């Protein structure tokens, strides 16, 4: 057999990730009071002050201010508060510049938090045309898990005749403006239904850290259980960077962590709890902390640790209560190659609704609808060059442009323009109207057979549909007549039944190729459950060796979107092993 071998250096395992927060965001449930432990002395908890730049909270173009106009008068800033955090104070400090032609007082800037008005700032004579720095205190009682801060520009430049399309109506906000939150950690209840919270925050935009504790030096089977958990953590972390520091013997000083334990290795802080009667997952209070939790992967022996970790990786979203006993080993049928959840299938046409988390991601609305983005990944060894294009059947619906107005749709693949179509009015539409949803009966619909140029394809791809509407401004030369602009609420939608067709391509890659491994975990990710992968560690591995191994396996899980529940770990590999990952100079 051919052996594929990569050695991971302890000098550092670092991967560059491209966050795509615009991709579908899961709505986070607010913390229910029933899920919080009562704090005897909430004031004793340490308060941390965190300040985030607007540009860090929302992807913004470099060196470009946030610009609002009469036609595009609102801008929204999303931000997340973790489930185990309580915001006691919140404020926003922003630098802004209004147009010099605005009428004072009549023009204003409104701030809303989660739909509720926080502050209305009339633009004074002294502020017109000048850069102003303003701090607004926000009501912390309105904060939830998933929040949205909205800026609304209300501009006026004439007492009688004015048009929202006038170019002199604008207000700019500096992208370096900041949001400041004062937070306290709170202790959530011992409830597995909250997973992956509080151990991994689904709304975090930065690096995630999940320490792993081994009460004693781990066996190969215990390391295998840890690798399965790391793969689940990587799948959960998705595009975020993930760190899994390893501790031997001593629990981390603070923060949430995971521990692997049998009756013989049960750490002191868990003694006296429920007896271990089989593979199980439980949640408990962490030692030396007023708020942290510990996720316990337990079993009567090392083999049951693997079963418990596999159950968490495969069925953790169905866990409930403080403790779950695994009564039957998880069913692990063999999986075919290239069936990773994140990789586009190549044996059939793929519908667009398979590429998004929620149907709403295929819709957009507004005077100027935001582009609709569809993200998809390809197997890293998919050989697309022999063909010049990929068939795409695209059906879309849109609000027809008004009389004398123009509209178009631009289709881009990885920022490269691949198609342009003029959107015709309802009266002049030549294609049949699609009427699949009653609410969309007023929208014109078209079916187009397009092709994606293969030269622009990569392992990770973004297909963007940018619907652009022009506003028709009517200008009258008659006395007493004012120019007018029709600000229609336009709605656009990509039909979920639209398809991409990657059938007929071959898989080919020259190995070894560290770039493919870094980008997608290939060749190990070829089987997403890592059924043919063995990670080789030195005998008696150091904590850093194990941490590097967990980071590598977690990275593969993040790129496939699939937990590697069949990965094996060995400190004494047999020569028959066919696909190996070597850590710490072990081979």
Where are each of the predicted segments found?
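Positively charged n-region of N-terminal signal peptides that target proteins for export
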Residues: 1-5
């Amino acid at each position: 057999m051919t052996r594929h071998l990569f050695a991971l250096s302890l000098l550092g395992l670092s991967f560059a990730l491209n966050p795509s927060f615009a991709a579908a965001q899961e709505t986070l449930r607010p913390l229910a009071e029933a899920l919080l432990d009562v704090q005897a002395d909430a004031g004793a908890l340490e308060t941390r002050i965190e300040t985030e730049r607007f540009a860090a909270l929302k992807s913004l173009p470099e060196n470009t201010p946030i610009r609002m106009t009469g036609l595009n008068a609102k801008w929204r800033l999303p931000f997340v508060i973790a489930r185990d955090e309580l915001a006691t104070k919140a404020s926003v400090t922003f630098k802004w510049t209004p147009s010099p032609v605005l009428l004072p007082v009549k023009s204003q800037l409104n701030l809303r938090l989660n739909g509720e008005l926080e502050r209305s700032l009339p633009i004074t004579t002294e502020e017109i045309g000048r850069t102003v720095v303003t701090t607004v205190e926000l009501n912390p009682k309105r904060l939830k898990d998933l929040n949205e801060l909205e800026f609304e520009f209300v501009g006026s430049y004439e007492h009688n005749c004015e048009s929202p399309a006038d170019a002199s109506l604008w207000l700019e906000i500096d992208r370096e403006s900041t949001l400041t939150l004062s937070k306290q950690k709170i202790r959530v209840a011992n409830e597995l239904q909250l997973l992956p919270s509080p151990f991994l925050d689904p709304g975090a935009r930065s690096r995630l850290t999940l320490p792993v504790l081994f009460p004693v030096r781990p066996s190969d089977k215990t390391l295998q259980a840890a690798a399965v958990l790391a793969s689940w953590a990587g799948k959960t972390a998705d595009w975020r960077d993930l760190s899994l520091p390893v501790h031997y013997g001593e629990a981390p000083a603070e923060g949430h962590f995971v521990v692997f334990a049998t009756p013989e290795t049960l750490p002191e802080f868990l003694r006296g709890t429920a007896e271990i009667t089989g593979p199980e997952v439980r949640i408990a209070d962490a030692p030396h902390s007023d708020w942290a939790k510990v996720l316990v992967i337990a079993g009567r022996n090392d083999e049951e640790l693997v079963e418990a970790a596999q159950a968490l990786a495969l069925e953790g979203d169905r866990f409930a209560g403080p403790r779950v006993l695994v009564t039957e080993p998880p069913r692990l049928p063999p999986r075919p190659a290239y069936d990773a959840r994140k990789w586009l299938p190549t044996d059939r046409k793929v519908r667009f609704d398979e590429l998004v988390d929620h149907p709403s991601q295929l819709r957009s609305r507004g005077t100027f609808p935001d582009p609709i983005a569809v993200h998809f990944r390809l197997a890293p060894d998919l050989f697309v060059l022999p063909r010049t294009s990929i068939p795409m059947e695209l059906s879309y619906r849109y609000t027809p442009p008004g009389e004398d107005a123009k509209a178009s749709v631009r289709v881009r693949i990885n920022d490269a323009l691949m198609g342009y179509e003029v959107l015709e009015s309802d009266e002049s539409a030549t294609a049949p109207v699609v009427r699949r949803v009653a609410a969309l009966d007023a929208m014109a619909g078209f079916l187009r057979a397009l092709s994606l140029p293969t030269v622009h394809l990569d392992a990770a791809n973004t297909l963007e549909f940018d619907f652009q509407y022009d506003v028709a401004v009517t200008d009258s030369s008659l006395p007493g007549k004012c120019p007018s602009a029709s600000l229609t609420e336009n709605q656009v939608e990509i039909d979920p039944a639209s398809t991409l067709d990657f059938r007929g391509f071959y898989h080919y890659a020259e190995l070894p190729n560290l770039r493919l491994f870094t980008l997608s975990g290939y060749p190990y990710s070829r089987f997403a459950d890592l059924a043919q992968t063995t990670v080789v560690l030195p005998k008696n591995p150091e904590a850093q060796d194990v941490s590097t191994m967990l980071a590598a396996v977690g990275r593969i899980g993040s790129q496939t979107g699939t937990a590697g529940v069949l990965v094996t770990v060995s400190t004494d590999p047999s020569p028959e092993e066919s696909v190996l990952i070597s850590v710490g100079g072990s081979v």
